[in-house]
Amino acid sequence: GDVYKRQGLERAARKVAKDYPDTAFLMGSSFTPVAPNFSVFDNWIHEPSYLSGMVAGAATSSNLIGMVGGYAIPEVNRLMHAFMDGAREVNPDVKFLVNFIDSWYDPPKAKESAFAMMDAGADVMYAERFGVSDAAVERGVKAIGNVIDTSGDYPGTIMASAIWHMEATIDKAVSRVADGSFEAADYGQYSFMAYGGGSLIMDESLMSSETAAAVKAREAEILDGLFRVNVNDARPTSDN
């Protein structure tokens, strides 16, 4: 499957980096950097994911949120857990249905999973994969976006999205290459909100002013270093 292909690609990239120690390498990876020249990055947007969870937790009337993911790997798991923690902050009674479709792109399968969750009572969907928001539109429920902004394609459905800005990571790496300071490092922190690597977008017309204000207050605390979002890379599961 795709995960094994990716692992094979990474092994090859690490071997090439070892063969060319004077060339800078930067790769998206859940694993560690290797001196002197192999650096890694990842989509550490758990902070805006937490904030989007606050939006969802306040929005659900059934207290059941559906979550459809691709693969249960660290960079997906941590965003889901952060989202769940944010939802629980504003709604301690909220429960979750979680499913992974074991594919990066299979909209029909994601849509089918989302429909099953809605049939079980979920009235807000976490759209980690394409297809979930389409299901939400058909059933008239709200959705939360992830990584990229697709709200323009689903007006009135996507309440908020946790957005990844990879440019912050790339810019830092390129600047270090340019000034000769590049070395093996983990560039994960440059996906944090404080570095401009992650952000939250909200459609405030789809939520109460109280919810929007609470989310903005928490966001300010994150940016000021007064609130830290927990990181949990373990596979999330449905509530019993």
Regions found by a protein language model. Give the residues of each.
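Short, small-residue-biased leader/transition segments that mark boundaries at the very start
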Residues: 3-4
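Hinge/cleft segment of the Venus flytrap/periplasmic-binding protein
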Residues: 178-240
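Flexible loop/hinge segments that line or gate small-molecule binding clefts
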Residues: 18-43, 147-157
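An alpha-beta-alpha
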Residues: 51-94, 98, 186-207
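Pocket-lining segment of extracytoplasmic ligand-binding domains
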Residues: 113-162
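Structural motif
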Residues: 102-118
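Flexible loop/turn connectors
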Residues: 148, 153-196, 200
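Short beta-strand elements at the ligand-binding edges of bilobed clamshell
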Residues: 33-58, 67-72, 155-168
